[in-house]
């Protein structure tokens, strides 16, 4: 009885080891920030493509919210980034404000700190994701937002007509870096607070991410 049992235990251990290797292989390459380099230059030199770049940002940003295990938080961040990228593709003024394309949006100065700040510990999450389950959530959210179908932030008549969302500002009230429950720009008349966001059969509450819609569409929109 001892020998078959021992073989069974060895087989089980081999399966577990194989499973761990498969899970680890889902994670992206671990990158390092060397002296004199910026986060952007490291990612570009490593050949990271836009889908992975978006996934890395969603992964790190979700952790910075304090709600890194919530799939809706991942989705909200991914859609927010793509809203900026898509609006910037058609509006020079929005491109100046939020950046050009996914890379420009992600690395726009002052927009996604601490996730892409060289001086922040959270940048380690961006450079070297280690949590497989959270990476899966981030990747699924990024794929959904990149696909572009069913954007939960397209709500107004203008947005439906142009198939673009004006929801481009967001704030994480539960983040350790939050200055309070409300965003610093809360009283800005150029932005309108969105409230809770329906996502399919679920709702992303504003207590997790506060989203803001531009009060007016850009006047230089190209078609």
Task: List PLM regions with ranges.
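N-terminal export signals and maturation junctions of secreted/periplasmic proteins
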Residues: 2-3, 7-51
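Bacterial extracytoplasmic/cell-wall-associated proteins, especially those involved in peptidoglycan
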Residues: 30-223
């Amino acid at each position: 009885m001892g020998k078959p049992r021992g073989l069974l235990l060895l087989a089980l251990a081999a399966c577990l080891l194989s499973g761990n290797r498969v899970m680890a292989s889902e994670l992206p390459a671990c990158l390092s920030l060397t002296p004199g380099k910026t986060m952007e230059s490291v990612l570009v030199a490593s050949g990271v493509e836009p889908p992975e770049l978006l996934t890395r940002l969603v992964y790190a940003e979700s952790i910075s919210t304090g709600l890194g295990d919530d799939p809706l938080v991942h989705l909200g961040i991914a859609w927010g980034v793509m809203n900026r990228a898509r609006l910037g593709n058609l509006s020079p003024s929005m491109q100046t404000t939020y950046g050009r394309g996914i890379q420009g949006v992600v690395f726009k100065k002052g927009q996604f700190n601490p996730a892409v700040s060289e001086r922040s510990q959270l940048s380690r999450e961006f450079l070297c994701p280690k949590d497989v389950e959270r990476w899966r959530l981030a990747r699924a959210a990024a794929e959904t937002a990149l696909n572009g179908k069913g954007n939960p932030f397209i709500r107004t008549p203008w947005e439906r007509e142009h198939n673009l969302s004006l929801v481009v500002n967001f704030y994480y009230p539960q983040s350790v870096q939050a200055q309070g429950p409300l965003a610093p720009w809360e009283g800005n008349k150029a932005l309108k607070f969105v409230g809770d966001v329906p996502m399919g059969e679920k709702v992303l509450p504003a207590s997790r991410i506060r989203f803001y819609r531009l009060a007016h569409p850009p006047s230089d929109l190209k078609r």
